[in-house]
Amino acid sequence: MIRSLRMQPNRKLYFKELPMPSTPGPGEVQVRMAFASICGYDMMMLRGTAAYPLNGYLGHEGSGVVTAVGENVRALHPGDRVTINPYEPCGLCDACRSNRPEYCTNPSSGYANLMTEYL
């Protein structure tokens, strides 16, 4: 079991016990989280001035160490240090078509629950 920091609708924080993530599937990696920041948006949610996060997830900026890789993963290996970007670029806007997905103007909204032990 692993622990994940969550927020209740009444804005109180708690740890939720979750099963250890399964072995990564094709194209997936498993990451042991090392750091996850509390950003301004997290603070707004905690203060009640921003929408309650989906499933009470907190954290969308973090880093960790790859612990396992699935089939067809070539660029990452166990032991590699990584940062996590929970947003999926749209692939259609000018930035994405110019190979600059970090400037995507229509990313998916992603709260990745980075305040956890493993992804």
Q: What does each model-identified segment do?
A:
Residues K16-L18:
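Short structured motifs
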Residues R6-L13:
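Extracellular beta-rich ligand/substrate-recognition surface
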